[in-house]
Amino acid sequence: MGCRDILLTFSVALLLISLFQIWLFREGRQVPELSDDQLGKDRNTLMTSKNKNKNEDVQRLFQRYFKGRSFGLNNTNSRFEDSNRRIPSSPDRLHN
C-alpha cells in the first residue's frame, strides 16, 4: 500500500498546483483593447505604423543575425566564403 499512498499524494499535489496556477492566471491583469471611438480617424495610420515598425524590426534583426548577407533563392553566389574554407594539406584524415 505504500506505492498507492505515494501515488495518491502526488496526484493531489499535482491537482493543487494546477488549481493554484489557474487561480493565479485568472487574477492576472488584462490589457483593454482600444475601441473605434478611442482610435478615431487615425486608426489606419496607427495600424500601418505598427506594421511598418514590425517590418523594420524584422529587417534589423535579419541584418544583425546574417551580417548583411543575402540568401535569395536565385542567388548565384556561393554560400560559403572562400576565406573561411579549409583545404586539406595531406591525404591523412587524422591530421586534417
Curated annotation (Swiss-Prot):
Keywords: Developmental protein, Differentiation, Glycoprotein, Hydroxylation, Secreted, Signal. The modification Hydroxyproline is found at P88, P91. Disulfide bonds: none annotated. Residues 1-28 form the signal peptide. One of its GO terms (molecular function) is receptor serine/threonine kinase binding. One of its GO terms (cellular component) is apoplast. Residues 71-96 are annotated as: Disordered. Belongs to the CLV3/ESR signal peptide family. This is CLAVATA3/ESR (CLE)-related protein 43. It comes from Arabidopsis thaliana (Mouse-ear cress). The gene is CLE43.
